[in-house]
Amino acid sequence: MTQVTVKELAQEVEAPVERLLQQMREAGLPHTDAGQVVTDNEKQTLLTHLKSSHKSKAEEPRKITLQRKTTSTLRVAGSKSISVEVRKKKVFVQRSPEEIQAEQKRELDERRAAENAARDKVEAEVRQRNEEQARRQAAGSAAAAPAPAAKPEPAPAAAPVAAPAPVVADAPASEDAAARAAERKKDETRRNESRTRDDDRRRGEAPRVSIKVKVKEKEKAPTPRAAPRTTDEESDGARRGRGGKSKLKKRNQHGFQNPTGPVIRDVTIGETITVSELANQMSVKGAEVVKFMFKMGTPVTINQVLDQETAQLIAEELGHKVTLVSDTALEDSLAESLKFEGQTESRAPVVTVMGHVDHGKTSLLDYIRRAKVAAGEAGGITQHIGAYHVETDRGMVTFLDTPGHAAFTQMRARGAKATDIVILVVAADDGVMPQTREAVQHAKAAGVPLVVAVNKIDKPGADLDRIRNELSVEGVTSEDWGGDTPFVKVSAKMGTGVDELLEAVLLQAEILELTATPTAPGRGVVVESRLDKGRGPVATILVQDGTLRQGDMVLCGSNYGRVRAMLDENGKPVKEAGPSIPVEILGLDGTPEAGDELSVVADEKKAREVALFRQGKYREVKLARAHAGKLENIFETMGQEEKKTLNIVLKTDVRGSLEALQGSLGGLGNDEVQVRVIGGGVGGITESDANLALASNAVLFGFNVRADAGARKIVEQEGLDMRYYNVIYDIIEDVKKALTGMLGSDVRENILGVAEVRDVFRSPKFGAIAGCMVIEGTVYRNRPIRVLRDDVVIFEGELESLRRFKDDASEVRSGMECGIGVKSYNDVKVGDKIEVFEKVQVARTL
């Protein structure tokens, strides 16, 4: 910006310095000397002052005239045309604020006068109607009594009615004039209101509340609405309708005003809540909550699950009241409603048979039950939990037979959880094995007593002392050695010692003093569940307390339903089951998880409410866990190569087998390959399972189930890989082979022979020829070689020429001399070693 002094400015405008200083003082500027600097703003102030002094203010014109000219041509007969020119002229006048205020005041006075006139008119009409009604009533009463009417006494009573007659006679003329005047003022008032509202909107002023109040008061009056509209009003309304402003819209306007302060809301927060639910409770958009959390340094999405503390912090920071609720309130109310009252009675013990695979657990139970269960299991190994009760001479005993294979760890843990006594079966010729130790750990974790059954004592290699010694290392000491665990020698094949085993079990049960309340509602645990094609979800229940009856409404984990039918372990229908009785129930809405607790509830509404709550809670916990896992692994997986994944869709016959297989298959793999069970369920392979496998490039595995017609059609058309299994060993081995194939192969070098250079010869054809002695292995022609000098590789190439006594040789064995020509290498020295090798591809293993 150029610095200009008063003197320079005077020279520029060609005016004396004294006159310019005088004008600047008149404009209110502080300049008194010719050397002072004048800024651009001060120049503008001086210019405005000079313009105002010459009556030429720089303002907008008060009047604007717009002229519009339209020219058109009309054609008439005879090829003649007539030019038509239409000129329109509009004048817009800008009024001063004083004029607008005076006009508004005048309009308000006129409106009040019109309202007063209309009110007077209404009061006059009401008064006239009342007087006419009183006169009619008086005339009717006079006609009903003719004798008194002939007397002169009633005349004074009629005088008050006839007195206002002159006023009523003069009223119509004055009322018509007042109505016309009021109507004209009303039209003018409406136009002024519209103009005033437009001016207010342009200036951004607040609406005139007093006028709105008057309009609302006028709307409340019933008479103006009931009055018929005249022709002038209708035409006026039509004209205003074309302008977009109707009388009806004005009537329907309300005087609602936005709240001046923030609205404080009550927010209810449970253990977990999503961002969208929190935003809905606070009546704000989800994006606002997301933006607020980004400012706090926490990136979230609108569907992310927040914990209670974080949600409370957000709601309180935004100024809302927070009420924390516990998610267990519904569960607590359910627990309070389940009352186990009544007389307690002794119940039969629940005994779980555990041990290593092929140690004879099921065969021992077969002898006790006088049945052949082991023959029915695929491969002769138990793959399901079998639950059945046995009536003995000494009382009833309920047995749970658990699998011994390593994949069924969860099944054995559930068996120990639902049991009173554990029979640990150990083969006398095999000793303590890994699953035997695991069974001891499960029994100790559940706090149940052990009874050790040393099986297969009829075999020649049976050694009872070895079993006692190995179990004592695990903390299980025999009674003969001063411990508290009974050891019983049995033979499932011959039946030896079975009675002593049952006696030891019942003795332990008497010590435990097991009791139950048969008259109470049933309560138990899910031992196994499956999806039957004809009957739907079927769950094996071990009743632990109370009595379960057909028709009861039961809640089982996140599933519920009414017991439609009950079957015992032999498949026979029963009406009720008491404590320690295993039964199969039908009627649930899904297959519950093995290990879920079953309870009889009062009504279906309560069962559905709790089941839906548990499903939602499980889903929220699963989402939160998945999100946490993503955040934890985001830096660990960064920069690593993506693993090769074998996708599997797995269908099994029972829920326990599904869990066991998912756990076993998930543990396979390494840093390069992994197994992912993308779909799993109980029941046959359906069309939806085949579509899932097709979409995700997965393999279909059926464990003791088969595919339906729709699934088989898709498998054949698309060429999917579908396999059936009935032994868990086979499915695990096949998956291991598939993963091994995905690993590929490694290239390994095998050293075939080593030759030591004893002398060097020159050949015009091959260059330097090394005279060598084969000191190790065999040297082959046309194989890759390495030249080593002081055990350091100095060259790697190919053996081009191999001769023995001037004859070409394909191989030279150890201890023989030969001549070796190395391709493209002539720097061979005495003492070097030539190493001949081959590259072999070797399959990798897990």
UniProtKB/Swiss-Prot annotation:
Query: Which PROSITE patterns does the annotation name?
Result: G_TR_2, IF2
The highest taxon in the source lineage is Bacteria
Q: State the residue spans of region: G5.
A: 491-493
Domain (tr-type G) spans 346-513
Biased amino acid composition, Low complexity: 136-148, 158-176
What broad class describes the main subcellular location of this protein?
Answer: cytoplasm
Query: Keywords of this protein's UniProt record, alphabetized?
Result: Cytoplasm, GTP-binding, Initiation factor, Nucleotide-binding, Protein biosynthesis
- Protein residues bound to GTP: 355-362, 401-405, 455-458
Coiled coil spans: none
- Which residues lie in Basic and acidic residues bias regions? 96-135, 177-206, 230-239
Q: Could you cite one Gene Ontology molecular function of this protein? A: GTPase activity
> Is-annotated flag, keyword Nucleotide-binding?
yes
| HAMAP family noted in UniProt | IF_2_B (MF_00100_B)
Tell me the protein family, please: Belongs to the TRAFAC class translation factor GTPase superfamily. Classic translation factor GTPase family. IF-2 subfamily.
Name by which UniProt lists this protein: Translation initiation factor IF-2
Question: Which gene is this protein's source?
Answer: infB
